[in-house]
Amino acid sequence: MKAIGRVILSAILLVLTGLMIAFAKAAPSVVFSFYPALSRSILSAIASVSGLVPIALWEVLAVLLALWFFYTLIRVFTGRRSLLCWLSGVLLGLSTGVFLFVAIWGLGHFGPSVDQTLGLDVREYSKQELIAATAYYAAQANEYAEKVERDAENLTVYPAFSELAKQAPGGYAALAQQYDPFTDGLGPVKPLASWRLFSQTGTTGIFICFTAEACVNPDTYTAWIPFTMCHELAHRQAVTAEDDANFCAYLACMASEDDDFRYSGAFGAYIYCHNALSKVDKTAASQIWSTLSDGVIADIRAANEHYAQYEGKVQDAAQKVNDTYLKAFSEESGVQSYGEAADLLIAWYLKNNA
Protein backbone atom coordinates (compact mmCIF):
# COMPACT_ATOMS: atom_id res chain seq x y z
CA MET A 1 0.00 0.00 0.00
CA LYS A 2 1.32 3.44 -0.90
CA ALA A 3 1.90 6.11 1.73
CA ILE A 4 -1.19 8.11 0.76
CA GLY A 5 -3.33 5.00 1.09
CA ARG A 6 -2.01 4.38 4.61
CA VAL A 7 -2.71 7.97 5.61
CA ILE A 8 -6.27 7.79 4.27
CA LEU A 9 -6.94 4.48 6.04
CA SER A 10 -5.47 5.90 9.26
CA ALA A 11 -7.78 8.90 9.01
CA ILE A 12 -10.80 6.62 8.50
CA LEU A 13 -9.90 4.53 11.55
CA LEU A 14 -9.40 7.62 13.72
CA VAL A 15 -12.72 9.08 12.58
CA LEU A 16 -14.48 5.80 13.33
CA THR A 17 -12.87 5.76 16.77
CA GLY A 18 -14.06 9.29 17.42
CA LEU A 19 -17.57 8.40 16.26
CA MET A 20 -17.69 5.40 18.60
CA ILE A 21 -16.74 7.57 21.56
CA ALA A 22 -19.13 10.36 20.55
CA PHE A 23 -22.03 7.93 20.17
CA ALA A 24 -21.23 6.32 23.53
CA LYS A 25 -21.32 9.74 25.19
CA ALA A 26 -24.46 10.87 23.35
CA ALA A 27 -26.51 7.70 23.80
CA PRO A 28 -25.01 5.72 26.70
CA SER A 29 -28.26 3.89 27.44
CA VAL A 30 -28.24 2.45 23.92
CA VAL A 31 -24.54 1.67 23.60
CA PHE A 32 -24.10 0.14 27.02
CA SER A 33 -27.19 -2.00 26.78
CA PHE A 34 -25.08 -4.33 24.61
CA TYR A 35 -21.43 -3.21 24.64
CA PRO A 36 -20.28 -4.77 27.97
CA ALA A 37 -21.60 -8.21 26.97
CA LEU A 38 -20.11 -7.81 23.49
CA SER A 39 -16.75 -6.78 24.94
CA ARG A 40 -16.71 -9.78 27.28
CA SER A 41 -17.57 -12.10 24.39
CA ILE A 42 -14.77 -10.73 22.23
CA LEU A 43 -12.30 -10.98 25.11
CA SER A 44 -13.36 -14.57 25.77
CA ALA A 45 -12.79 -15.47 22.13
CA ILE A 46 -9.33 -13.90 22.16
CA ALA A 47 -8.49 -15.56 25.49
CA SER A 48 -9.38 -18.96 24.08
CA VAL A 49 -6.33 -18.54 21.84
CA SER A 50 -3.90 -16.65 24.10
CA GLY A 51 -4.76 -19.02 26.94
CA LEU A 52 -3.20 -21.91 25.05
CA VAL A 53 0.25 -20.72 26.12
CA PRO A 54 1.28 -20.39 29.79
CA ILE A 55 3.34 -17.24 29.29
CA ALA A 56 2.10 -13.72 28.65
CA LEU A 57 1.70 -13.78 24.88
CA TRP A 58 1.53 -9.99 24.68
CA GLU A 59 5.10 -9.70 26.01
CA VAL A 60 6.36 -11.88 23.15
CA LEU A 61 4.37 -9.87 20.62
CA ALA A 62 5.65 -6.60 22.12
CA VAL A 63 9.26 -7.73 21.65
CA LEU A 64 8.58 -8.79 18.05
CA LEU A 65 6.85 -5.48 17.36
CA ALA A 66 9.80 -3.54 18.80
CA LEU A 67 12.23 -5.54 16.66
CA TRP A 68 10.14 -4.90 13.57
CA PHE A 69 9.98 -1.20 14.40
CA PHE A 70 13.76 -0.88 14.63
CA TYR A 71 14.30 -3.09 11.57
CA THR A 72 12.11 -0.86 9.42
CA LEU A 73 13.72 2.26 10.91
CA ILE A 74 17.17 0.96 9.98
CA ARG A 75 15.92 0.42 6.43
CA VAL A 76 14.97 4.11 6.34
CA PHE A 77 18.45 5.20 7.43
CA THR A 78 20.09 2.86 4.90
CA GLY A 79 17.96 4.30 2.10
CA ARG A 80 16.01 1.13 1.37
CA ARG A 81 12.73 2.68 2.46
CA SER A 82 11.49 6.25 2.27
CA LEU A 83 10.84 8.20 5.46
CA LEU A 84 7.33 9.11 4.30
CA CYS A 85 6.49 5.47 3.69
CA TRP A 86 7.80 4.53 7.14
CA LEU A 87 5.93 7.32 8.92
CA SER A 88 2.68 6.43 7.17
CA GLY A 89 3.16 2.82 8.27
CA VAL A 90 3.70 3.88 11.89
CA LEU A 91 0.63 6.11 11.70
CA LEU A 92 -1.47 3.24 10.37
CA GLY A 93 -0.21 0.92 13.09
CA LEU A 94 -1.03 3.42 15.83
CA SER A 95 -4.44 4.21 14.35
CA THR A 96 -5.29 0.52 14.10
CA GLY A 97 -4.20 -0.01 17.70
CA VAL A 98 -6.32 2.86 19.02
CA PHE A 99 -9.36 1.72 17.03
CA LEU A 100 -9.11 -1.88 18.24
CA PHE A 101 -8.45 -0.79 21.83
CA VAL A 102 -11.60 1.33 21.95
CA ALA A 103 -13.73 -1.18 20.04
CA ILE A 104 -12.69 -4.23 22.06
CA TRP A 105 -12.50 -2.79 25.56
CA GLY A 106 -11.71 0.90 25.96
CA LEU A 107 -15.21 2.20 25.22
CA GLY A 108 -16.20 0.89 28.63
CA HIS A 109 -14.47 3.91 30.18
CA PHE A 110 -17.46 5.95 29.08
CA GLY A 111 -20.09 3.55 30.40
CA PRO A 112 -21.87 3.12 33.73
CA SER A 113 -19.74 2.45 36.78
CA VAL A 114 -19.95 -0.62 38.99
CA ASP A 115 -21.94 1.21 41.66
CA GLN A 116 -24.70 1.80 39.11
CA THR A 117 -24.76 -1.79 37.87
CA LEU A 118 -24.76 -3.16 41.43
CA GLY A 119 -27.23 -0.61 42.77
CA LEU A 120 -24.92 1.01 45.31
CA ASP A 121 -25.59 4.47 46.73
CA VAL A 122 -22.29 6.27 46.19
CA ARG A 123 -22.49 9.80 47.53
CA GLU A 124 -20.65 12.21 49.79
CA TYR A 125 -20.12 10.42 53.08
CA SER A 126 -19.86 11.81 56.57
CA LYS A 127 -16.65 11.36 58.52
CA GLN A 128 -18.45 9.01 60.90
CA GLU A 129 -19.48 6.76 58.00
CA LEU A 130 -15.88 6.63 56.81
CA ILE A 131 -14.67 5.83 60.32
CA ALA A 132 -17.24 3.05 60.70
CA ALA A 133 -16.32 1.51 57.34
CA THR A 134 -12.59 1.67 58.09
CA ALA A 135 -13.13 -0.02 61.46
CA TYR A 136 -15.22 -2.71 59.77
CA TYR A 137 -12.57 -3.57 57.19
CA ALA A 138 -9.85 -3.46 59.87
CA ALA A 139 -11.78 -6.05 61.89
CA GLN A 140 -12.25 -8.13 58.75
CA ALA A 141 -8.52 -8.01 58.02
CA ASN A 142 -7.79 -9.07 61.60
CA GLU A 143 -10.20 -11.99 61.29
CA TYR A 144 -8.65 -13.46 58.16
CA ALA A 145 -5.08 -12.62 59.18
CA GLU A 146 -5.37 -15.42 61.72
CA LYS A 147 -6.35 -17.91 59.00
CA VAL A 148 -3.34 -17.56 56.69
CA GLU A 149 0.07 -19.15 57.06
CA ARG A 150 2.84 -16.93 58.44
CA ASP A 151 6.61 -17.19 58.68
CA ALA A 152 8.94 -16.57 61.62
CA GLU A 153 8.68 -12.80 61.07
CA ASN A 154 4.87 -12.98 61.18
CA LEU A 155 4.58 -12.20 57.46
CA THR A 156 2.03 -13.79 55.15
CA VAL A 157 3.10 -16.93 53.32
CA TYR A 158 1.00 -17.90 50.30
CA PRO A 159 1.15 -20.87 47.91
CA ALA A 160 3.13 -20.54 44.68
CA PHE A 161 2.06 -17.87 42.19
CA SER A 162 0.84 -20.55 39.76
CA GLU A 163 -1.51 -21.99 42.39
CA LEU A 164 -2.97 -18.60 43.28
CA ALA A 165 -3.36 -17.83 39.56
CA LYS A 166 -5.54 -20.91 39.11
CA GLN A 167 -7.68 -20.05 42.14
CA ALA A 168 -8.20 -16.37 41.26
CA PRO A 169 -11.16 -16.87 38.85
CA GLY A 170 -13.08 -18.77 41.54
CA GLY A 171 -14.34 -15.64 43.26
CA TYR A 172 -15.82 -14.31 40.03
CA ALA A 173 -17.47 -17.65 39.32
CA ALA A 174 -19.28 -17.26 42.65
CA LEU A 175 -20.17 -13.61 41.96
CA ALA A 176 -21.53 -14.56 38.52
CA GLN A 177 -24.29 -16.49 40.27
CA GLN A 178 -25.51 -13.27 41.90
CA TYR A 179 -24.61 -10.31 39.67
CA ASP A 180 -24.93 -9.76 35.92
CA PRO A 181 -21.67 -7.81 35.39
CA PHE A 182 -19.62 -10.89 36.27
CA THR A 183 -18.96 -14.10 34.37
CA ASP A 184 -17.29 -17.40 35.13
CA GLY A 185 -14.98 -19.43 32.91
CA LEU A 186 -12.07 -17.01 33.24
CA GLY A 187 -8.62 -18.36 32.55
CA PRO A 188 -5.77 -18.18 35.08
CA VAL A 189 -3.76 -15.03 35.64
CA LYS A 190 -0.30 -14.98 34.03
CA PRO A 191 2.97 -13.78 35.56
CA LEU A 192 4.90 -10.98 33.90
CA ALA A 193 8.23 -12.23 32.59
CA SER A 194 9.58 -8.67 32.48
CA TRP A 195 8.68 -8.11 36.13
CA ARG A 196 11.91 -6.24 36.92
CA LEU A 197 10.96 -3.51 34.47
CA PHE A 198 7.43 -3.30 35.86
CA SER A 199 8.72 -3.16 39.44
CA GLN A 200 10.80 -0.13 38.53
CA THR A 201 7.70 1.61 37.20
CA GLY A 202 5.61 0.69 40.24
CA THR A 203 3.30 -1.55 38.22
CA THR A 204 1.83 -4.54 40.05
CA GLY A 205 -0.36 -5.78 37.22
CA ILE A 206 -1.60 -5.06 33.72
CA PHE A 207 -4.43 -6.11 31.45
CA ILE A 208 -3.87 -6.21 27.69
CA CYS A 209 -7.13 -6.30 25.76
CA PHE A 210 -5.44 -7.23 22.46
CA THR A 211 -4.57 -10.64 23.91
CA ALA A 212 -7.18 -10.62 26.72
CA GLU A 213 -4.47 -11.44 29.25
CA ALA A 214 -4.67 -10.50 32.93
CA CYS A 215 -1.06 -10.36 34.09
CA VAL A 216 0.43 -9.74 37.53
CA ASN A 217 3.93 -8.81 38.59
CA PRO A 218 5.21 -11.75 40.69
CA ASP A 219 7.34 -9.24 42.61
CA THR A 220 4.16 -7.79 44.12
CA TYR A 221 4.22 -7.98 47.92
CA THR A 222 2.74 -11.31 48.99
CA ALA A 223 -0.36 -10.07 50.82
CA TRP A 224 -1.37 -8.02 47.77
CA ILE A 225 -1.00 -10.76 45.13
CA PRO A 226 -4.52 -12.33 45.31
CA PHE A 227 -6.11 -8.87 45.37
CA THR A 228 -4.06 -7.75 42.37
CA MET A 229 -4.96 -10.91 40.46
CA CYS A 230 -8.65 -10.25 41.02
CA HIS A 231 -8.15 -6.61 40.01
CA GLU A 232 -6.72 -7.60 36.64
CA LEU A 233 -9.45 -10.22 36.15
CA ALA A 234 -12.00 -7.46 36.70
CA HIS A 235 -10.53 -5.71 33.66
CA ARG A 236 -10.85 -9.02 31.80
CA GLN A 237 -14.60 -8.76 32.44
CA ALA A 238 -14.86 -5.35 30.77
CA VAL A 239 -14.57 -3.38 34.02
CA THR A 240 -12.39 -0.51 32.87
CA ALA A 241 -12.24 2.08 35.67
CA GLU A 242 -9.48 1.50 38.21
CA ASP A 243 -11.57 2.22 41.30
CA ASP A 244 -14.26 -0.14 39.97
CA ALA A 245 -11.67 -2.86 39.36
CA ASN A 246 -10.32 -2.44 42.89
CA PHE A 247 -13.80 -2.79 44.35
CA CYS A 248 -14.53 -5.83 42.19
CA ALA A 249 -11.24 -7.31 43.38
CA TYR A 250 -12.47 -7.00 46.96
CA LEU A 251 -15.80 -8.64 46.10
CA ALA A 252 -14.08 -11.49 44.26
CA CYS A 253 -11.60 -12.08 47.07
CA MET A 254 -14.35 -12.23 49.67
CA ALA A 255 -16.46 -14.51 47.43
CA SER A 256 -13.55 -16.93 47.16
CA GLU A 257 -13.54 -20.12 49.19
CA ASP A 258 -9.86 -19.60 49.96
CA ASP A 259 -8.86 -17.69 53.10
CA ASP A 260 -5.69 -16.48 51.36
CA PHE A 261 -7.87 -14.50 48.97
CA ARG A 262 -10.23 -13.33 51.70
CA TYR A 263 -7.36 -11.96 53.75
CA SER A 264 -5.90 -10.19 50.72
CA GLY A 265 -9.30 -8.65 49.94
CA ALA A 266 -9.87 -7.43 53.49
CA PHE A 267 -6.25 -6.25 53.69
CA GLY A 268 -6.66 -4.15 50.55
CA ALA A 269 -10.06 -2.78 51.58
CA TYR A 270 -8.72 -1.64 54.95
CA ILE A 271 -5.73 0.11 53.38
CA TYR A 272 -7.90 2.03 50.88
CA CYS A 273 -10.25 3.18 53.63
CA HIS A 274 -7.39 3.94 56.03
CA ASN A 275 -5.71 6.13 53.42
CA ALA A 276 -8.97 8.00 52.82
CA LEU A 277 -9.57 8.46 56.56
CA SER A 278 -6.00 9.64 57.19
CA LYS A 279 -6.66 12.60 54.91
CA VAL A 280 -9.58 13.86 57.02
CA ASP A 281 -8.94 12.58 60.56
CA LYS A 282 -5.49 11.27 61.44
CA THR A 283 -6.49 10.70 65.05
CA ALA A 284 -9.38 8.40 64.12
CA ALA A 285 -7.17 6.61 61.60
CA SER A 286 -4.53 6.05 64.29
CA GLN A 287 -7.10 4.74 66.75
CA ILE A 288 -8.30 2.14 64.25
CA TRP A 289 -4.70 1.31 63.36
CA SER A 290 -4.11 0.47 67.02
CA THR A 291 -6.77 -2.25 66.77
CA LEU A 292 -4.91 -4.12 64.02
CA SER A 293 -3.37 -7.47 64.78
CA ASP A 294 0.40 -7.87 64.73
CA GLY A 295 0.14 -9.88 61.51
CA VAL A 296 -1.71 -7.16 59.59
CA ILE A 297 0.69 -4.47 60.81
CA ALA A 298 3.68 -6.63 59.89
CA ASP A 299 2.33 -7.08 56.35
CA ILE A 300 1.62 -3.36 55.90
CA ARG A 301 5.09 -2.36 57.03
CA ALA A 302 6.77 -5.05 54.94
CA ALA A 303 4.77 -3.97 51.87
CA ASN A 304 5.79 -0.34 52.38
CA GLU A 305 9.45 -1.33 52.70
CA HIS A 306 9.21 -3.53 49.62
CA TYR A 307 7.81 -0.79 47.39
CA ALA A 308 10.02 1.97 48.81
CA GLN A 309 13.05 0.43 47.09
CA TYR A 310 11.54 1.18 43.68
CA GLU A 311 10.61 4.82 44.28
CA GLY A 312 12.38 7.26 41.98
CA LYS A 313 12.30 9.10 38.66
CA VAL A 314 11.38 6.03 36.60
CA GLN A 315 8.31 5.37 38.72
CA ASP A 316 7.36 9.06 38.68
CA ALA A 317 7.54 9.13 34.89
CA ALA A 318 5.46 5.95 34.63
CA GLN A 319 2.86 7.44 36.96
CA LYS A 320 2.60 10.53 34.76
CA VAL A 321 2.05 8.37 31.66
CA ASN A 322 -0.63 6.33 33.42
CA ASP A 323 -2.23 9.51 34.76
CA THR A 324 -2.46 10.93 31.23
CA TYR A 325 -4.02 7.71 29.92
CA LEU A 326 -6.64 7.55 32.68
CA LYS A 327 -7.64 11.19 32.25
CA ALA A 328 -7.86 10.74 28.47
CA PHE A 329 -10.49 8.06 29.04
CA SER A 330 -12.74 10.03 31.39
CA GLU A 331 -11.17 9.05 34.72
CA GLU A 332 -10.84 12.66 35.84
CA SER A 333 -8.88 11.87 38.99
CA GLY A 334 -6.21 10.06 37.00
CA VAL A 335 -4.01 7.82 39.12
CA GLN A 336 -5.87 9.06 42.20
CA SER A 337 -8.83 6.98 40.99
CA TYR A 338 -6.98 4.01 42.48
CA GLY A 339 -7.95 5.43 45.89
CA GLU A 340 -11.57 6.20 45.10
CA ALA A 341 -12.38 2.54 45.65
CA ALA A 342 -12.92 3.73 49.22
CA ASP A 343 -16.21 5.33 48.13
CA LEU A 344 -17.45 2.01 46.79
CA LEU A 345 -16.22 0.15 49.85
CA ILE A 346 -18.08 2.54 52.15
CA ALA A 347 -21.24 2.16 50.07
CA TRP A 348 -20.92 -1.62 50.25
CA TYR A 349 -20.41 -1.50 54.01
CA LEU A 350 -23.45 0.73 54.53
CA LYS A 351 -25.61 -1.42 52.26
CA ASN A 352 -24.75 -4.60 54.13
CA ASN A 353 -24.56 -3.19 57.65
CA ALA A 354 -27.45 -0.74 57.75
Kindly give the residue locations of the regions a language model identified.
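N-terminal membrane topogenic signal
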Residues: 1-12
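Membrane-embedded alpha-helical segments of integral membrane proteins
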Residues: 14-75
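Active-site recognition of the HExxH zinc-binding catalytic motif
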Residues: 54, 225-246, 250-251
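Transmembrane alpha-helices and immediately adjacent membrane-cytoplasm interface residues
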Residues: 67-74, 80-116
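Membrane-interface segments at or immediately adjacent to transmembrane helices
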Residues: 108-177
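Post-HExxH zinc-binding segment in Zn-dependent metallohydrolases
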Residues: 128-133, 240-285
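Auxiliary, metal-adjacent structural segments of Zn-dependent hydrolase domains
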Residues: 152-218, 222
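Pan-zinc metallopeptidase signature
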Residues: 294-354
